[in-house]
Amino acid sequence: MSRKQAKLQPRREFLKLAAFTGAAALAGKTAPAVAEPPGPAPAADAPASDNKMEFLRVSGRQIVDAKGNRVRLRGTCPGGWMNMEDFINGHPGAEHTLRAQMAEVLGPARAHFFFERLLDYFFNEDDVIFLRKTGASVVRIPLNYRHFEDDEAPFKYKESGFSRLDQVLRHCENHGLYVILDLHSAQGWQNVHWHSDNASRISLLWTVSSYQDRYVALWREFARRYANRAVIAGYDVLNEPCSNNEIGDYPFNIYSNYRPSWDRINSLFRRVVSEIRKVDSRHIIFLEGDNYAKQFMGFEKPFDDNLAYSSHNYTVPGFGPGQYPGTVHPRSATGSGSEEWDLAKQERFFLDAEGTKFTQQNNVPLWVGEFGSVYNGPPDENPDRLRALDDQIGIFERNGAHWTTWNYKDIGVMGMLTLNPASPYMERIGDLLRKKRALGTDDWMKWLPPTPVKDATAQLAGQILQVVGDSQIDPGLNARCVSQALLCFYTGTLMQPLYAGLFKGLSETEMDHILSSFSAKQCVPNHGLVNVLSKYMAKPA
């Protein structure tokens, strides 16, 4: 295939998929060359759209509309839009340090242009139409607080962030797609990982009252603005909280050694729900379990009549490598294992999960806010990953769980849409991606084969442990923590000037052309994934 043919291919693929889903309207839309200036934020009492979307509420273990009809929330998450992540967008390190490096290298004005264009192209009306035509009923939008509030000006809210969110809310309203607002990156960081825009490996939200005050106040502001917007299905008030490892990930406080601080998380969740209810009595509020949405059994019983709960349900066969059903070989920092997985084991995994048990015991809805499979491992194993995902969704459906996949769009890892490898953006960052892969900076991608740098890091972790001489420290967990600290956080941030330098000296027109690679019509659909999701999304509630 010639380069010209490769560049035309994503549009052809997009239009083929549009025809498959009935989305012929997609063919006529293009992203603007220059974004319109943001308009004023709509008032909280803005009228509903012509779609007559209805407020949703909790009724026992179900979610229903105003007439009491059952509603099933099925959809995805546009991670990488208003909360960037390294493996989704292609950059190294955390978003806020990347923005600082881009401003340093490109200058503040050109860096601002870069990020605004990325936001313009990454998720817009074309994407909303695409999702509706696949059958999605909801989109969970991950948000970084920095779009709405600056650390230098706490409690002063930025209309630019609300205006951008409002624009997408209007698109969703016009096309009948419900929205769940997800605070993915909170003030002071609710966990110690990169996906909360954290470059420090510490978490301050749980111990610093000023961060808690700002977090609660921001949610009150969201609720004040959107109290009368039926397009919003609810508020996911905190993504993947981790209430009790504020010093960072260490072998003694992760995985089976993690112990939630139930007093902290129960207190903060009660406070934020109370503050929201002062201005918004109608929207569902979703609470995620502690320890990255996995632990629930220390939660208070539901204390509001419109609460639902959210777990995350990533499973080994969705990542591989290996066959499904059959033997899967999950990788760790110190080697690979072997596990047998099939439908029955996936079902046991789901039914044994604390989120499943808690919601059953308390007669409240369960929403699996994140789960997914990956497609950048061995290409011949992609059918195995799809079979695992298909079985997983079938289990959710049989048990009445609502669900949203992770992730909607990315650079070729797990998205419904992926950037074309021949696109201007992917060609420009190709060498950097190879360096990232060699250095193991994307901590998420643990399923890929180890590189010499990863092996050397594991050896270093072993040498550290040998000198420390504490036999109680698990070698695998130690290697995992050393790798994350050294490669994801330190090395990822170290590489950010290299990423910024790739865009130095470009005109705004050139930059716009490169970033248009993120537009829906230039992306390549993952047809296998879309077909699996559409099969379930199109089903009645």
Predicted regions and their residues:
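Aromatic- and acidic-residue-enriched carbohydrate-binding clefts of CAZyme catalytic domains
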Residues: 92-114, 154-159, 191-209, 252
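Aromatic-rich peripheral "rim/lid" segments of glycoside hydrolase catalytic domains that contact
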Residues: 378-541
